[in-house]
């Protein structure tokens, strides 16, 4: 599957691969938080301080990795900011695997809400 096809499947997330074909290749999955994508899930814990920013997405992704893809915990790293969720690695296939699984989670709002109920505020 091409990067273009994969990105269509991952919308509104975007997978970016840098320096492809070199030993310095790396990839990152990004979600710019300029829309209300899944904000209702984060609103379920608003009273606890969750607002749906990049750090809150990190908290959700951490629970997802711990419970669904623990083998990727050591190879992925977060680089989020308040207005952006980002996770990446030099292991492009690991980022793709995470991206597909995490997007599937987001498409299942009840499972997403369940996992988010175990997230810890950073």
Describe each region flagged by the PLM.
Residues 1-84, 89-97, 104-122:
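Structured alpha/beta or helical-core interaction and ligand-binding surfaces enriched in interleaved
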């Amino acid at each position: 599957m091409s990067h273009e096809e994969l990105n269509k499947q991952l919308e509104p997330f975007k997978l970016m691969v840098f320096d492809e074909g070199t030993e310095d290749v790396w990839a990152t999955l990004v979600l710019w938080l300029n829309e209300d994508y899944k904000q209702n899930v984060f609103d379920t814990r608003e009273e606890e301080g969750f607002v749906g920013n990049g750090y809150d997405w990190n908290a959700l992704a951490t629970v997802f990795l711990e419970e669904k893809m623990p083998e990727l915990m050591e190879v992925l790293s977060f680089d989020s900011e308040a207005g952006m969720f980002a996770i990446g690695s030099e292991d492009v296939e690991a980022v793709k695997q995470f991206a597909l699984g995490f997007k599937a989670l987001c498409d299942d709002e009840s499972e997403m809400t369940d996992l988010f109920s175990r997230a810890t505020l950073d």
